[in-house]
Regions:
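Conserved structural locus in ABC ATPase nucleotide-binding domains
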Residues: 50-52, 80, 137
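Conserved catalytic motifs of ABC-family nucleotide-binding domains
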Residues: 71
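ABC ATPase nucleotide-binding domain "signature" loop
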Residues: 82-84
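Helix N-cap at the start of a conserved alpha-helix in ABC-type nucleotide-binding domains
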Residues: 86-88
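ABC transporter nucleotide-binding domain
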Residues: 91-179
Length: 186
């Protein structure tokens, strides 16, 4: 299992090359150096650069490169695109998708960026405080999910409902999602 968690620990004083050599010693026989350097090259990370001089997003990608080099069967990635700007995030999402398919890897990931999920996942689980709200193939969610926007009168309190997920109100506008079809709500 390869695990990437938010706030991952790295040796800040090392360079990209030094940290790869350090981690490789812990995985004799299974370390895939080429997977690490392929990702570093794809993201244009300079291998002589010290980790302490990298952005948060670059550090995340170094951590992910180290995980890919471990060659795990299962990758667990928590907020894997944290700190990446949209261009690099898109590049990385495409790389991760292609890597998982070509290497036959299973990837369990979390993200708050729905656009990334549409391009990466086959099945989706939507959770709220540890409770599974929905578990379906992504194609079905995209087909059946509905987005609604309502104008809320000033001072009106909304009642709680199990039919709406993650409501948010900004400037008297309620934006919510439902996976019930209009015919099911009548």
């Amino acid at each position: 299992i390869g695990l990437l968690i938010e706030g991952h620990v790295q040796y800040q004083f090392m360079t990209i090359t030094e940290i790869e050599k350090f981690y490789a010693a812990f995985y004799p026989g299974q370390w895939k150096k080429e997977a690490y350097y392929e990702l570093m090259n794809k993201l244009k990370v300079v291998t002589r650069q010290r980790i302490s001089r990298m952005s948060c997003g670059q550090r995340s990608q170094v951590a992910l490169g180290l995980i890919l080099a471990q060659n795990p069967e299962l990758l667990v990635l928590d907020d894997f695109s944290l700190g990446l700007d949209p261009g690099y995030r898109r590049l990385f999402v495409d790389y991760l998708r292609d890597y998982a398919r070509s290497e036959g890897k299973t990837v369990f990931l979390t993200s708050h960026i729905i656009q990334d999920m549409e391009r990466l996942v086959d099945d989706c689980i939507i959770m709220d405080y540890g409770k599974i709200l929905i578990q379906k193939p992504i194609a079905e969610l995209l087909e059946k999910g509905r987005r609604y926007t309502f104008t809320i009168p000033e001072g009106y309190e909304l009642p709680a409902s199990d039919d709406f997920y993650h409501p948010s109100i900004m400037r008297n506008q309620l934006e919510t999602f439902s996976f019930l079809q209009p015919a099911e709500t009548e």
